């Protein structure tokens, strides 16, 4: 019996190369090798680096822990890397965990008790902390004190344990999902932005040197243009293009070979993959380019609504292919042009669609 592939299914050979979330390969030794070890080595995020240099210098002069920090922005932009750099600059340890791993009070209690003076605790996806764990962090962040409840019912007692001064660094893709009491306890809240092509080119050339991958600057630019403004994706695409060039029997990554390899992987000239194009084409063809809600797009494409919102939408919004209006998501004329669907552009649709409708 022949099995037909649904039009809503990606090609069987396609990897999810453009997800900003780390793969298993990227969480192991290879990622450690390409991670910058100091602020000087860190490429991009100039405003953030300038602020952190002042914070580090002041904390060192006073011999104090850095104030608590909150990093927010799309995944893959370097929040974890920046936490590790801060620890290295301060000469302290960095304990890394994620909010979903802190299910029970003893999970966070054990970590806090074992921190050394001025150590850094990095909590990824901090917006997903449960209420009990979050409330344990309040006195820990404010007074370096851990309040532990011993016993149950009327016999319950609260025991306070002193903690050494430490720095909590939270990372989130949804800063608006943090409760006000938690957000207000961070002394510095910084946004990480998408990277420019020039910055990604420098990152790719640096990674190519570390991995001993021959590449021209033009080849690096071609990969950078398709990397969705995200270093993690840039390094991933570099490795896949390296494989393509090797199998082709070539010795150096040129812009032509980079373009060929990425086209074969369904990554187009703007960094859109199969799913990006499916989302945009569905909104254009099935909903006639009219404003449409997130759940409707998810149902029509067969993709998870959360995945569309957190993985695909940020970049489409960034490059101006998608707008959010009070009535729903709207595809812009720039996206029609990129997809070769200008003929389907509604006649009353201006070439520069405003971000909001009035």
Curated annotation (Swiss-Prot):
It catalyses: ATP + H2O = ADP + phosphate + H(+). Coiled coil: none annotated. GO terms for molecular function: ATP binding; ATP hydrolysis activity; four-way junction DNA binding; four-way junction helicase activity. The keyword Cytoplasm applies. Belongs to the RuvB family. Homohexamer. Forms an RuvA(8)-RuvB(12)-Holliday junction (HJ) complex. HJ DNA is sandwiched between 2 RuvA tetramers; dsDNA enters through RuvA and exits via RuvB. An RuvB hexamer assembles on each DNA strand where it exits the tetramer. Each RuvB hexamer is contacted by two RuvA subunits (via domain III) on 2 adjacent RuvB subunits; this complex drives branch migration. In the full resolvosome a probable DNA-RuvA(4)-RuvB(12)-RuvC(2) complex forms which resolves the HJ. This is Holliday junction branch migration complex subunit RuvB. The lineage of its organism: Bacteria, Bacillati, Cyanobacteriota, Cyanophyceae, Oscillatoriophycideae.
């Amino acid at each position: 019996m022949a099995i037909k592939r649904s039009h809503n299914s990606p090609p069987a050979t396609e990897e999810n190369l453009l997800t900003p979330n780390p793969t298993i390969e990227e969480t192991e030794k290879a990622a450690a090798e390409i991670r910058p070890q100091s602020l000087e080595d860190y490429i991009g995020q100039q405003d953030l680096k300038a602020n952190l240099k002042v914070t580090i210098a002041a904390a060192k002069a006073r011999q104090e822990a850095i104030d608590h920090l909150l990093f927010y922005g799309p995944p893959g932009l370097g929040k974890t890397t920046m936490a590790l750099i801060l620890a290295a600059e301060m000469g302290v340890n960095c304990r890394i965990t994620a909010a979903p791993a802190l299910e029970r009070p003893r999970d966070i209690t054990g970590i806090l008790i074992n921190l050394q003076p001025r150590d850094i605790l990095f909590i990824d996806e901090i917006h997903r902390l449960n209420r009990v764990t979050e409330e344990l962090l309040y006195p820990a962040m404010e007074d370096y004190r851990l309040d532990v409840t011993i016993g149950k019912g009327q016999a319950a007692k609260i025991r306070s344990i002193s903690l050494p001064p430490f720095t909590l660094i939270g990372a989130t893709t949804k800063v608006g999902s943090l409760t006000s009491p938690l957000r207000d306890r961070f002394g510095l809240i910084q946004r990480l932005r998408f990277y420019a092509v020039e910055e990604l080119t420098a990152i790719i050339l640096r990674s190519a040197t570390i991995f001993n991958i021959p590449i021209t600057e033009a080849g690096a630019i071609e990969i950078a243009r398709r990397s969705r403004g995200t270093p993690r994706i840039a390094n991933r695409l570099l490795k896949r293009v390296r494989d393509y060039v090797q199998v082709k029997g070539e010795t150096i990554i040129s812009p032509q070979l980079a373009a060929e390899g990425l086209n074969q992987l369904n990554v187009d000239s703007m960094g859109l993959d199969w799913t990006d194009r499916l989302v945009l084409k569905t909104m254009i063809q099935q909903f006639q380019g009219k404003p449409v809600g997130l759940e409707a797009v998810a149902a029509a494409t067969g993709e998870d609504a959360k995945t569309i919102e957190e993985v695909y939408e940020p970049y489409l919004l960034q490059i101006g292919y998608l707008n959010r209006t009070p009535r729903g998501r709207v595809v812009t004329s720039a996206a029609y042009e990129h997809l070769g669907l200008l003929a389907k552009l509604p006649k009353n649709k201006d070439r520069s669609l405003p971000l909001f409708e009035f």
